Design a protein with these regions (language model features):
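Conserved protein kinase catalytic core
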Residues: 27, 86, 113-115
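Conserved beta-sheet core of the metallophosphoesterase superfamily
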Residues: 90-143
Length: 206
């Protein structure tokens, strides 16, 4: 399976906008490896993880080029790459610096909160990078105006869609008893961090 996928261009204000999806090669180790293996333990999927990031950049560039060839005026990347130093060379900032043709990157993975950061691409053009953080604290907003891309984070949104709000509340009410049911108790504290504050998950026994 390809690491990058493409959504056929849709018309927005008379322009064709293509959306491409990018998953981090860290998926191999930051999820369950068996998800990507056959019954014999052989890996059957790729995330274009080789050559110190070059395979990822090339695969994304191929996808961007295909979108442009298909008539896209703009290309927006929906990425799950993050900006953590430990994720180099697969960070969203690395990707932008080594590709062209992407007009904006809406990122995830590292749970970073970024309203808009301008990152230079391979041609030196500044590309907006945005990430909404985690747990629905923010809603990301992308605006395209006269060919210019800007991003921002919305934190105060009092107006709700009545139909959606009613639907969500019906699910919450339906599951209220279930989610408040005690299924087990532990005599020890279950923590996600060591005593010194460093993260224990995926680093040591918890």
């Amino acid at each position: 399976a390809l690491m990058a996928s493409i959504k056929l261009p849709e018309r927005v204000a008379g322009k064709k906008v293509a959306v491409i999806g990018i998953s981090t090669p860290e998926s191999f180790v930051k999820s369950t490896p068996t998800y990507f293996q056959d019954k014999d333990g052989n890996y059957i999927y790729t995330f274009a993880e080789g050559n110190n990031g070059a395979d990822l950049y090339n695969k994304v560039q191929e996808t961007v080029n295909a979108a442009k060839k298909d008539g896209a005026t703009y290309v927006v990347a929906i990425a799950h790459l993050g900006i953590d130093e430990s994720s180099e060379p697969w960070r969203s900032t690395d990707l932008i610096a080594n590709t062209t043709g992407i007009d904006a990157v809406l990122d995830g993975h590292s749970h970073s909160t970024i309203a808009m950061e301008l990152v230079k691409n391979k041609d030196g053009k500044e590309i907006p990078l945005s990430s909404t953080g985690t747990k629905l604290v923010n809603i990301g907003k992308l605006t395209i105006s006269d060919g210019k891309f800007t991003t921002e984070l919305v934190t105060d949104y009092a107006v709700k869609d009545d139909a959606t709000d009613t639907f969500v509340k019906s699910i919450q009410e339906k599951n209220e008893a279930l989610v408040n049911t005690v299924v087990a108790k532990s005599s020890v504290d279950l923590t996600t961090k060591r005593a010194d504050g460093t993260r224990a998950i995926r680093n040591r026994e918890t």
